[in-house]
């Protein structure tokens, strides 16, 4: 009877302990999900609820090769955006094509209590140079020299003697199909990509970006030597934006660890008490 009662109480204590562990695990998961959901809701309210009140957008584009530039700025607040672009000409003695594009966009959303500022700038420059020189020389020299010596006869009354001497000297010199071909080809291309993304709160945003926008190349040949001269000049673009913002801190001090410790301790005490009671019986 005592053995049966002890086994029954031990089974009950084991079931209670397993239920307590599962309950504490579920509470910890719920607490973590609640914290994640609270942060996502707050971020959505900041970006969606207050983002449509104020907006500032600027798009800048320029093309150096065609010599054309266009810019459009739309304003709906007191924000100010100043842009200075300096472009220098590109010269190449053989053939060169240079294209560069600069784009900048700034969006500002603000309210009475919370402000979110996001700035994205990207610059891409592509320079390509291709030079092909070919020289072909063909020299053909042909020389033929020949010397022929034929018959000599000597005769007397008593005895006839005939001597024949044949001598042929042939000198032939042939130079043909002497070809000298020189192919000089040079191709160089460079791609410079600079992109930066930043999020700033209650801090004036000042970004200076320097983009190499012009490249000149000269090629000179003297005798049998070749020389390349590369000259790079930089064009400077300044983009500045100022904004005022307020900041508020939200903290949640209750964590999932507190739930696990609190409920785990309570169920552990209950299990120990059940085991001690079974032993006393």
UniProtKB/Swiss-Prot annotation:
Region named Disordered: 52-94, 106-227
Record field: transmembrane: none
Main location: membrane
Residues anchoring lipid (GPI-anchor amidated serine): 256
Subcellular location, record wording: Cell membrane
Membrane in keyword set: yes
Residue ranges the record assigns to the propeptide: 257-281
Regions of compositional bias (Low complexity) in chain numbering: 69-94, 106-158, 167-203, 210-227
The keyword ATP-binding appears for this protein: no
Superkingdom, taxonomy of origin: Eukaryota
Membrane topology of this protein: Lipid-anchor; GPI-anchor
GO cellular component: plasma membrane; side of membrane
Full protein name: Predicted GPI-anchored protein 39
Species this chain originates from: Candida albicans (strain SC5314 / ATCC MYA-2876) (Yeast)
């Amino acid at each position: 009877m005592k053995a049966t009662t002890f086994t029954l109480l031990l089974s009950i204590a084991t079931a209670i302990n397993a239920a307590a562990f599962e309950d504490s695990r579920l509470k910890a998961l719920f607490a973590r999900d609640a914290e994640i959901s609270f942060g996502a809701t707050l971020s959505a309210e900041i970006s969606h609820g207050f983002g449509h009140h104020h907006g500032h957008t600027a798009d800048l584009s320029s093309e150096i090769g065609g010599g054309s530039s266009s810019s459009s700025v739309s304003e709906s607040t007191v924000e100010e955006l100043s842009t200075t672009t300096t472009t220098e000409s590109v010269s190449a003695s053989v053939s060169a094509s240079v294209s560069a594009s600069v784009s900048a966009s700034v969006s500002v959303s603000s309210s009475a209590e919370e402000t979110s500022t996001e700035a994205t700038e990207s610059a891409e420059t592509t320079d390509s140079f291709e030079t092909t020189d070919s020289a072909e020389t063909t020299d053909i020299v042909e020389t033929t020299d020949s010397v022929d010596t034929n018959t000599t006869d000597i005769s007397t009354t008593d005895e006839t003697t005939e001597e024949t001497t044949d001598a042929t000297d042939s000198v032939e010199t042939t130079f043909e199909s002497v070809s000298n071909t020189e192919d000089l080809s040079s191709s160089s291309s460079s791609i410079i990509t600079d992109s930066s993304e930043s999020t700033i709160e209650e801090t004036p945003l000042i970004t200076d970006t320097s983009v190499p926008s012009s490249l000149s190349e000269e090629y000179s040949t003297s005798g049998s030597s070749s020389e390349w001269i590369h000259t790079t000049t930089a064009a400077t673009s300044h983009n500045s934006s100022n904004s005022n913002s307020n900041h508020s801190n939200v903290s949640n001090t209750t964590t999932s660890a507190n739930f696990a410790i609190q409920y785990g301790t309570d169920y552990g005490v209950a299990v120990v008490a059940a085991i001690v009671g079974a032993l006393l019986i």
